[in-house]
From Swiss-Prot:
The gene is infA. It is found in: Cytoplasm. The keyword Protein biosynthesis applies. Belongs to the IF-1 family. The keyword rRNA-binding applies. This is Translation initiation factor IF-1. Keywords: Cytoplasm, Initiation factor, Protein biosynthesis, RNA-binding, rRNA-binding.
C-alpha cells in the first residue's frame, strides 16, 4: 500500500488504551481504534485524551488507523 492510498482525517482522542492504542472520534462522527506511528513513538511525542490528531486510515479497514500528527 503506497502513501497515496491512505485516507487522512482529523479527530479528537477520546480514550487512551493499553499498548499505545487510542480511541479517536473523527470529525465526521465515526470512532476508530488508532496506534501511534513510529516517528511519533521514536521522538517521545505524548498523546493525551482531548488532543487533536491526524489519523491515516487504510481503504481496506476503516475501523483502524495510525496517528501521524498531534496538535494542541
Amino acid at each position: 500500500m503506497s502513501k497515496e492510498d491512505v485516507i487522512e482525517l482529523e479527530g479528537t482522542v477520546i480514550e487512551a488504551l493499553p499498548n499505545a492504542m487510542f480511541q479517536v472520534q473523527l470529525d465526521n462522527g465515526h470512532k476508530v481504534l488508532a496506534h501511534v506511528s513510529g516517528k511519533l513513538r521514536m521522538n517521545f511525542i505524548r498523546i493525551l485524551p482531548g488532543d487533536r490528531v491526524v489519523v491515516q486510515l487504510s481503504p481496506y479497514d476503516l475501523t483502524r488507523g495510525r496517528i501521524v500528527w498531534r496538535s494542541k
